[in-house]
Amino acid sequence: MTNKNAYAQSGVDVEAGYEVVERIKKHVARTERAGVMGALGGFGGMFDLSKTGVKEPVLISGTDGVGTKLMLAIKYDKHDTIGQDCVAMCVNDIIAAGAEPLYFLDYVATGKNEPAKLEQVVAGVAEGCVQAGAALIGGETAEMPGMYGEDDYDLAGFAVGVAEKSQIIDGSKVVEGDVLLGLASSGIHSNGYSLVRRVFADYTGEEVLPELEGKKLKEVLLEPTRIYVKAVLPLIKEELVNGIAHITGGGFIENVPRMFADDLAAEIDESKVPVLPIFKALEKYGQIKHEEMFEIFNMGVGLMLAVSPENVERVKELLDEAVYEIGRIVKKENESVIIK
């Protein structure tokens, strides 16, 4: 018995791994950008920081996954957008610190290497990288029989970006009186899916619920996370933004306070929040308390900006999309987030 056959008998298909690498090359090529050095397949991805033109570069990194949204991708056998979710979760975090994404690495672990399926996953990662302007410079695909079921896989990623030292957004510039602007989310994004799956556990995904405006449930649940990089970078370059909050797990309550000092609070006018239909459906069918929704989900606002009043109109002009004035920064009395 050869080593190759012995390995195959243990459940690891080396040839399938080679096939995955060949399949994903064209997707990786889409993400090429200035600064990338070397080719796919090296022991480490390389990037020439001098190509960014940043005078005082500070590297900012972020890592994340997509949680149990993966279980719905597997359930509905749709794998071509979950990679975008993974990229979004990472790059939206680092843009909140003022960083332009430079490159991305992904990690996929699976019980059985299915090249066609994994190509779809990486194609989604590549699409996310294109939207973020980041190069996909490396990754790992691990076949782990016994750790995962044959149809199961997990996905995580790691993003690195750069900011001018003087343009880092760390909350120190947010002051009382700043206006809170909300940028629309595309849907649930990638948080709260353990609850989402419980609410819709008995649904096939083919249902067209009256709240969902003609869309199938599975389409809404797997809507990829919006990537905010290209919308927000021009604002950072012009130093128009004092604070940024990426609304992820923990909703408004946990994430908004992360962009300002402990002596401040966010006062939010609930009537100005563009609540998406899926959140109304979740609240109704899951019998979730209304106030708890803001502790779990983005409620239609995926990114929140704190902006000086005199810069609001310029920010709206540059964004060229629907921008929601949903509140303001006030002095903290008790709670860090007040929703009225």
Swiss-Prot record:
Q: Which domain of life is it from?
A: Bacteria
One GO BP annotation of this record: adenine biosynthetic process
Q: Which GO terms describe its cellular component?
A: cytosol
Q: Which reactions appear under catalytic activity for this entry? A: 2-formamido-N(1)-(5-O-phospho-beta-D-ribosyl)acetamidine + ATP = 5-amino-1-(5-phospho-beta-D-ribosyl)imidazole + ADP + phosphate + H(+)
Recall the GO molecular function terms of this protein's record: ATP binding; phosphoribosylamine-glycine ligase activity; phosphoribosylformylglycinamidine cyclo-ligase activity
* UniProt keyword annotations, A-Z: ATP-binding, Cytoplasm, Ligase, Nucleotide-binding, Purine biosynthesis
Concerning InterPro entries, the annotation shows:
PurM-like_C_dom (IPR010918), PurM-like_C_sf (IPR036676), PurM-like_N (IPR016188), PurM-like_N_sf (IPR036921), PurM_cligase (IPR004733)
Q: In which pathway does it act?
A: Purine metabolism; IMP biosynthesis via de novo pathway; 5-amino-1-(5-phospho-D-ribosyl)imidazole from N(2)-formyl-N(1)-(5-phospho-D-ribosyl)glycinamide: step 2/2
What is the main EC category here? ligase
Q: What is its EC number?
A: 6.3.3.1
Is-annotated flag, keyword Cell cycle?
A: no
Family annotation (Pfam families): AIRS (PF00586), AIRS_C (PF02769)
Localization, per the record, is: Cytoplasm
**Keyword Ribosomal protein: yes or no?**
no
Principal subcellular localisation of the protein:
cytoplasm
Q: Which HAMAP family match?
A: AIRS
**Family listed:** Belongs to the AIR synthase family.
Q: Give the protein's recorded name.
A: Phosphoribosylformylglycinamidine cyclo-ligase
Q: Which organism is it from?
A: Streptococcus pneumoniae (strain Hungary19A-6)
Taxonomic classification: Bacteria, Bacillati, Bacillota, Bacilli, Lactobacillales
